Every structure is written in C-alpha cells, then in structure tokens.
Amino acid sequence: MTGRGKGGKGLGKGGAKRHRKVLRDNIQGITKPAIRRLARRGGVKRISGLIYEETRGVLKVFLENVIRDAVTYTEHAKRKTVTAMDVVYALKRQGRTLYGFGG
C-alpha cells in the first residue's frame, strides 16, 4: 500500500473516486488552538473570543492574495505546477520578503 488512494502513480491516471470529499468551508480547519498557538508565538497572553473568526477572515484574504499572485507567476511561465519560488516572488511583490526557499 502506497497511500495514494485509487489514482495510481502517474499523472492523469486517476479514475472517478468513489468517496469524493465534499469541500466545505476549509477555513474552519484553522482551529482555535492553532490560532492560540500563533498568538502565543507572537507574545499574546489573553485572547478575546471574537479574535478567532476575525483571524480566519484576515488569513483567508492574505492567502487568497498570495496564491493569486503565485498562480499568475506560474501561468506566465507556462507551467501547471506552482513552485516555491512562485510563492517567494508573490510574497516579495507584496512587500513580505521570505528567505530560505531558494533564489
């Protein structure tokens, strides 16, 4: 068992999956404890209950912007795979330079 499901190894070989996971609002996957850990890393001691939904909203907007720029770089290079460098350039374009991922 390779853990790849029913798709096989190659690209584009996957047939119809029997139990397709329904994509709900995935932003709820950013759990309350995860947000709490991020806040602790930033030095926060107490957290209001209203913070969690607000944080999810801000994170969603931020990721949408970064991913949109990264996909734009990918499409311009006529590729179908978003690379780490696409994300690095997208972050740099938004004024958030990230070191340690090449380039």
Curated annotation (Swiss-Prot):
GO BP, one annotated term: nucleosome assembly
The entry's keywords: Acetylation, Chromosome, DNA-binding, Methylation, Nucleosome core, Nucleus, Phosphoprotein
Residues annotated with N6-acetyl-N6-methyllysine modification: 6, 13
One annotated GO molecular function: protein heterodimerization activity
Modified residues (N6-acetyllysine): 6, 13
Cellular localisation: Nucleus; Chromosome
Biased composition (Gly residues): 1-14
Domain of life the protein comes from: Eukaryota
Main location: nucleus
Modification type N6-succinyllysine: residues: 32, 78, 80, 92
PTM description: Acetylated on Lys-6 (H4K5ac) and Lys-13 (H4K12ac) during prophase I of meiosis. Phosphorylation of H2A 'Thr-119' is a prerequisite for H4 Lys-6 acetylation but not for H4 Lys-13 acetylation. Acetylated on Lys-6 and Lys-13 by the Ada2a-containing (ATAC) histone acetyltransferase complex.
InterPro entries tied to this protein: CENP-T/H4_C, Histone-fold, Histone_H4, Histone_H4_CS, TAF_TATA-bd_Histone-like_dom
UniProt KW Acetylation keyword: yes
DNA-binding region: 17-21
Subunit and partners: The nucleosome is a histone octamer containing two molecules each of H2A, H2B, H3 and H4 assembled in one H3-H4 heterotetramer and two H2A-H2B heterodimers. The octamer wraps approximately 147 bp of DNA. Interacts with Nasp; the interaction is probably indirect, mediated by histone H3.
Family the entry assigns: Belongs to the histone H4 family.
Entry function: Core component of nucleosome. Nucleosomes wrap and compact DNA into chromatin, limiting DNA accessibility to the cellular machineries which require DNA as a template. Histones thereby play a central role in transcription regulation, DNA repair, DNA replication and chromosomal stability. DNA accessibility is regulated via a complex set of post-translational modifications of histones, also called histone code, and nucleosome remodeling.
Annotated protein name in UniProt: Histone H4
Organism, scientific name: Drosophila melanogaster
Taxonomic placement: Eukaryota, Metazoa, Ecdysozoa, Arthropoda, Hexapoda
